[in-house]
Amino acid sequence: MKTELIVHKGVHVKKSMLHGWGVFTSSKIKKGDIVEECIIPYDMIPTNTNALINYRFIWPDISFKAAKELGVDVQFSGYCLPLGFGSIYNHSEDPNIDWDIDLSERVVQFTAIKDIKAGEELLFNYESPLVNH
């Protein structure tokens, strides 16, 4: 069981040229590095709520990565709201981070999918089947 969460050195929030607020880095991040781990502290948000609808992630019965590896479909059982910077990252069709959910630890983990320079905004593709933006 995790006893602490990772936030990469230099990761911070500021105004974005893309949309509202965004998550940026003031230090280099290498491909494969964990950018941030966000805790999901409570049970999933019921599917009939309208609260924070634009910031929620779909809560699966199996992680997206595991489903892909096993060749099975992901079933969705509700929504979650990751704490930390999890709901602040902006969208890009050319992302520099990706994410997956560790169901046993109740953590969303964001990972660099390419080398990221200091000063860049950290972006992921909202078109993932697990994001409800």
Model-flagged regions — what are they?
Residues 1-133:
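Conserved catalytic SET/PR domain of SAM-dependent protein methyltransferases, capturing the structural core
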